[in-house]
Amino acid sequence: MTQDQLKQAVAQAAVDLILPKLDDKSIVGVGTGSTANCFIDALAQHKGAFDGAVASSEATAARLKGHGIPVYELNTVSDLEFYVDGADESDEHLNLIKGGGAALTREKIVAAVAKTFICIADASKLVPVLGAFPLPVEVIPMARSHVARELVKLGGDPVYREGVLTDNGNIIIDVFNLQITNPVELETQINAIVGVVTNGLFAARPADVLLLGTSEGVKTLKA
């Protein structure tokens, strides 16, 4: 199977997992990126089975609306049963690196609200140790140099992602060459740097379920 076929398979598996638990009042949290887009397309086939969605980015909101799925502001939603999103890396404990698409802050907020965080990914994203994929950090623009110096102290090689502004108007620094043996600790350390909005480690709040697309079919891992 191609990578696109694996993404479509896990997206459909996520729809199959949540659909029996949805009703006409349900609102679904939706992530950002190519795998999340596959989920949106699959979910749209059942748009009469739930109320609407909360989007983690402007791009996701536009895709949902394009399918005729109502999009709600998170502040107006009191109950979010599911959040479904992809990942750039996952370890066996379902700690994740996310943010390749620069939507990490809103993704992390929606994930924090959701009762169940379902991560969907192809098999290449499962790794023994996080960090081969550079860790994105969302930063207030005036703090860029300060944050970069602090990230060097933590052992990383920070690189400014040129030409990218987040939906929140901030910049992204990608941190290379981190061996992330304690994701929760590193997530806390980086978030404590003045000027950091948040970083792409989802470890304090990891995924609850990982649906992994493999050549043998979709495998389910739980934290």
From Swiss-Prot:
The keyword Cytoplasm does not apply. Keywords: Isomerase. Pathway: Carbohydrate degradation; pentose phosphate pathway; D-ribose 5-phosphate from D-ribulose 5-phosphate (non-oxidative stage): step 1/1. The active site is at E107. Substrate binds at T32, G33, S34, T35, D85, G86, A87, D88, K98, G99, G100, G101, K125. The keyword Isomerase applies. It is an enzyme of class 5 (isomerase). Catalyzes the reversible conversion of ribose-5-phosphate to ribulose 5-phosphate. Homodimer. PANTHER family: RIBOSE-5-PHOSPHATE ISOMERASE. This is Ribose-5-phosphate isomerase A.
